[in-house]
Amino acid sequence: LTAVFTRRNPENALARRNLVLDRMASAGAITRYQRDSIAALPILLNYKPVSHNEGPATYFREMLRLTMNAERPKRRQFQNDWDYEQAVKEYDENPIYGWCLKNTKADGTPYDIYRDGLKIYTTIDSRMQEYAEQAIQKQMESVIQPQMDAQFKRTKTLFIDADRQERERIMRNAIRYSDRYYQMQKAGVDEKTILASFDKPCPMKIFTYKGERDTVLTPRDSILHHKRIMRAAMVSLDPATGFVKAYVGGPNFRYFKYDMAKQGKRQIGSTIKPFVYTFAIDHLGLSPCTPVPNLPVTIETANGVPWSPKEAGKVEQNGEMHPLSWGLARSRNNYSAWIMKQAKQPQAVANFIHNMGIHSYIDPVPALCLGTSESNVYEMVSAFSTFANEGVYTTPIFVTRIEDRQGNLIASFAPRTQDAISEHTAYTMLTMLEGVIHSGTGGRLGWAYNMQNVEVGGKTGTSQKNRDAWFMCVLPKLVAGCWVGGEDQAVRLVSRGEGSVIALPIVGEFLNRIYADPSTGISKQDLFTRPAVMPVYDCDETEKTDDSATRYEEDEFFE
């Protein structure tokens, strides 16, 4: 084949084509006039080599490559023992991790995903993947990035609340991890010359959400430009099967290699609150209608220092009694703290949350109820799927089978499941998460994306000082989550950077595209599975439509 490969051997390819034309003419398949006319034409190629930087699901493909080629985790790769132990457990128990090293061919050598002709069947739905990428592109291009650009133009400040030492540290690390630095160092260029090159203007391409742009900048200014680009990540999966349907780790894999869907972890803010409320229902015997006083809460911590969370903005704490569901819908910090005070043991709450699917380390302190811990979109979506899967946690799965080049099955994969909570608790939490959408901080999904009459639950989240914006969404057949933020936590939107403002619209856009495509199998008529015997909770306040609440942009900072 190489001998007549058009790109490598154009003369041989031309001779071979004309030979075929001669034989077709001799057989009467074409006339001699047609043969002569075609033979006079050159062979034109529309050749474009396949690049790992382009095409659909670039972040997913890279995650798959890294996963299948992964070595057993080492302690030095993790900040704490807990995360290291969880990574080792996942590596040992999940066969897709390190598959190429764990399995060998007949000759005893490991599999090579590049050379062995493997056919890897993934769970990604090409339609949903496209819709997720389109939703992120639309919101980032039209709303979020212009907001950041306007802020930078107004303030002339990129790294918010960062002193000179911190700004220098950020830039120093960015330079030393850049491809330019690596290539020059590899070529033997000395450090002084390398660093000087970052201040010399040169022609280059830079990323914008409107497309690549040719310009002349210093490499240092190029780094600053790309630091200003806001990032977003989204994951969606089928809660019943654990199949990952869409996976977007960032805006453009060529320019931003770091995967914020699974690789990067950020503070999860109020997206942890549904799990704290689940503990209250499952372990403390409370219900959505349990009355709780709207008052400040103080808890004495293990070291004897009292802790009392603050509320964001001008929130009135007037002592009125409201049902527990009211606190979740409005994401009140004092209601989450009240649950922690009843629980008494933060470690018990942390263990419970781990069992529901958040395997990242959770510091067992009262403040865990406000989302001070870190996780990623992939993990959060899988944990939220427990609510839609009748209380059963299903590990995410993104490969179903692997075949060799002859089509022989050599590996198949199935999700692992564990009972996390009862189906009654799961359904109760679904009704409370619906309250977040229909009468709480997630109201924008209803009135802006026409989902007032859809069975959909969700939770907004915003970490301190708008560093991280989150939105998690639960449907009967799909769970989706989105994170928005800067590459560095010092890069953030000072105002209007809350989860309900910048993360929720991405999910809303994604869902509307799915609903508009019947072939996805997702419909606005889908219903959550209700247990055969289920108490009816009729909390008067949660049934009222509170327009001011649903249009409220929460500012869920914690201190």
Positions of predicted regions on the chain:
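Non-catalytic, structured segments within soluble enzyme domains
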Residues: 1-183, 339, 354-355, 359, ...
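Second-shell loop/turn segments in exported
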Residues: 2-11, 20-21, 25, 45-55, ...
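Extracytoplasmic/secreted proteins, especially bacterial periplasmic and envelope-associated proteins
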Residues: 12-23, 37, 59, 63, ...
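Conserved catalytic neighborhood of penicillin-recognizing serine enzymes
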Residues: 48-66, 286-346, 393, 405-430, ...
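A penicillin-recognizing enzyme superfamily signal
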Residues: 58, 122-142, 173-238, 243-248, ...
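A small/polar active-site loop signature that marks catalytic segments
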Residues: 86, 103, 333-354, 460
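Active-site rim segments in enzyme catalytic domains, especially the processed small/beta chain
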Residues: 259, 263-303, 439, 512
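Mid-domain, small-residue-enriched loop/turn segments at the edges of structured enzyme/sensor domains
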Residues: 306-311, 343-382, 391, 395
